[in-house]
Regions:
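ASCE RecA-like P-loop NTPase motor cores
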Residues: 1-183
Length: 183
């Protein structure tokens, strides 16, 4: 999406040099890119322009590290206004006590990881804490993902076994995510 700000950024000769250098740097394990000294609006326009102009070379989502989660949310909203698909990979909530805890954050994290595997994002925003944390390997996530189609018959005992193996809890009445019931 071209805006006045991204058009001005793209017209700058220094942006052209940065874009060429960035495109040359894409490889199996690309190095991070840091841009500093820009005011907030210019930094946003630079980021949007780079994300749009390197989409083909990236071959996947860009990882954007923000200092805090509130910055991820703010930047994610901005990128979405420019038409970019973003995911927010939040830090894991650690529970040190044996207590019932909401797994809502875990569900959101798995949703982003699944979206990454499916190519649903142009960029994933996260904090250093979240990026450095352990998570499920892609092959295990793919293996444990169950796709249910309304027009296909289900083997209910096999489905229950797979859901239980993936960490879901069988209950009589579902009242929160992570639970399932058979009728």
């Amino acid at each position: 999406m071209n805006s006045i700000l991204t058009s001005v950024i793209r017209a700058d000769p220094e942006y052209g040099q940065l874009l060429r250098a960035t495109k040359q740097d894409f490889r199996a394990n690309p190095l991070p890119i840091l841009a500093s000294g820009l005011c907030e609006g210019a930094a946003d326009a630079l980021l949007v322009s780079l994300l749009e102009d390197t989409e083909r070379e990236r071959g996947g989502a860009a990882l954007i590290l923000c200092p805090e989660e509130k910055d991820c949310v703010k930047l994610g909203g901005l990128l979405e206004r420019f038409g970019l698909r973003t995911g927010f990979y939040m830090a894991r909530d650690l529970t040190f006590y044996n207590m019932t805890a909401s797994h809502e954050y875990e569900h959101e994290r798995i949703k982003v990881l699944s979206g990454l595997m499916a190519g649903e994002y142009d960029a994933v925003l996260t904090t250093p804490d979240a990026a450095l944390g352990y998570t499920v390997p892609p092959e295990i996530l793919k293996k444990t993902t169950v796709v249910i189609n309304a027009d296909e018959p289900l083997d209910l005992p096999e489905l229950a076994k797979r859901l239980t193996g993936a960490g879901f809890v069988r209950v009589d009445l579902v009242d929160s995510p992570g639970q399932f019931a058979l009728r």
